[in-house]
Regions:
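Non-catalytic cap/lid and distal C-terminal segments of serine-dependent acyl enzymes
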Residues: 27-358
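N-terminal signal peptide c-region/cleavage motif recognized by signal peptidases
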Residues: 20, 24-25
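Hydrophobic ligand-binding cavity/cleft-lining segments
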Residues: 17
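N-terminal export leaders
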Residues: 8-13
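N-terminal secretory signal peptides that target proteins for export/translocation
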Residues: 1-7
Length: 358
């Protein structure tokens, strides 16, 4: 998949807010519990970064008793740099086991993992003329395609959107855009309160020192572009494309946070904040309906402080919808499967498991 294969996953995970075709369906021997389904990606065709439009989703369907009448779907959004492709290996087996365990306890859930990466690793699951329309791709293409494929048209309450890190942000942000499409959100260590989670990253010297010439080479057409030599630059390029596009008349272009002299551009930062879920909730805390269930978590020792913004968001929306916050032990990317399963148990109003002894 072109640029995607060049991503250094381990470095991205360490530096970022991160975790982190076939036709029809094919069971992969590397992870027999997941199937790969190719989505045409019509809404990504002609995207300004030249990224692939056709992508695969990873789908796990648990084994169910015959009398099970309904199978709900969890649309899972991985963290920055992650995608469905990660779930065709060892990582997928752990999630498959967790979802089979939930099904065995009377919580029948199909897990769908999407691929919304771009040239720099992650789209933040947003529509932007600097990268493409990834929220529309998820809402208007992936979900309808799969519901038709499986023959299971769903009511909004049959759909749960979930994610970790940038994917947790994406789950919240997409649900805010289209609250009528989902019944619940499970957001693990989401990118909330950018002053805490994002600003320390963009204030690093390596970001301040990017020159206009370097920036131009990074955003050049695929056949001419240069790959950033530092993974943090690559991440901030992706965040900039998501949060600060120049507009539809300049596809693929975005505003940088520093001018040619390295001076902070406050108006560009304000563009970023316009997408911050905490900022959005302060303006309008009635984002979700009373029937929605919003589960937020953040690690006790989260390296990016994601638990802080999650608590703020909880307090803002709590008077108007059902919301829960859980501070999990460990760091940003620890115990993801257990944390996700606990969030889903809360959605189903079941007894909550302990996570890391808590």
């Amino acid at each position: 998949m072109g640029f995607f294969n060049d991503l250094s996953r381990r470095a991205v995970l360490a530096a970022a807010l991160a975790w982190s075709g076939f036709s029809g369906a094919t069971c992969l021997t590397a992870a027999p519990h997941f199937e790969a389904i190719s989505i045409p990606g019509r809404l990504l065709e002609g995207n300004p970064l030249g990224d692939p439009s056709q992508r695969r989703v990873a789908v796990f369907t648990p084994k169910l008793p015959r009398f099970t009448s309904k199978l709900l779907t969890v649309y899972y959004l991985p963290g920055y740099g992650g995608s469905s492709e990660d779930f065709f290996g060892g990582n997928g087996e752990h999630f498959a086991a967790a979802f089979q365990n939930l099904a065995d306890k009377g919580m029948p859930l199909r897990m769908v993992v999407v691929d919304c990466r771009n040239r720099w690793g992650g789209s933040q699951y947003l529509n932007s003329p600097a990268q493409g329309n990834y929220a529309d791709y998820l809402l208007e293409e992936v979900i309808p395609f799969l519901e038709k494929y499986y023959g299971t048209p769903a009511t909004p309450r049959d759909r749960i959107i979930a994610g970790h890190s940038s994917g947790g942000f994406g789950a919240l942000r997409v649900a805010m855009m289209a609250p009528e499409r989902f019944g619940a959100v499970v957001a693990l260590s989401p990118d909330t309160d950018f002053e805490v989670t994002h600003k320390p990253l963009v204030e690093e010297h390596v970001i301040k020192s990017v020159t206009p010439k370097q920036l131009a080479s990074y955003v050049a057409p695929p056949e001419l572009m240069l790959k950033p030599g530092h993974n943090l630059i690559q991440i901030v390029l992706g965040l900039s494309a998501a949060y600060a596009p120049k507009g539809p008349n300049e596809p693929g272009e975005f505003h940088w946070l520093y001018d040619e002299k390295g001076n902070w551009q406050a108006e560009v930062w304000q563009n970023w904040l316009e997408e911050d879920t905490v900022v959005i909730a302060r303006r309008n805390p009635h984002l979700f309906m009373p029937y929605h269930k919003i589960y937020l978590d953040g690690a006790e020792h989260d390296e990016f402080g994601a638990q802080k913004g999650a608590k703020v968001l909880r307090d803002l929306i709590k008077p108007y919808t059902r919301v829960e916050f859980f501070e999990s032990p460990g760091g940003h990317a620890d115990l993801i499967e257990d944390r996700l399963a606990r969030g889903l148990e809360w959605v189903f109003e079941r007894k909550l498991r302990t996570v890391g002894g808590r």
